[in-house]
């Protein structure tokens, strides 16, 4: 049932929905929806020491396949789908500021939080 709900998001197909459901397993194990990003390795690496404060690339912890599939879903949403929705407009607005690759990673992270919240609520995606 959850896979059908997840597939209502533009760019998310059977493969993405099944991989996400398999990686998460139980949506209630995450206290907040925002905790899914670090779990999937879709957050920036941080290095701090004294006055030094560097942000690195994504942390790439666990779930390598799921992270790759979410990246592909973000790519499909941004580059191939013609659905006009708030998520796509948000991602397109990021491209001039941070570049395509970082915008795709940010969209993949946003997709993961969206999919988790949809799975918890059982509500389908409604494009705006």
Model-derived regions, located:
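A detector of single, family-specific signature residues
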Residues: 1-128
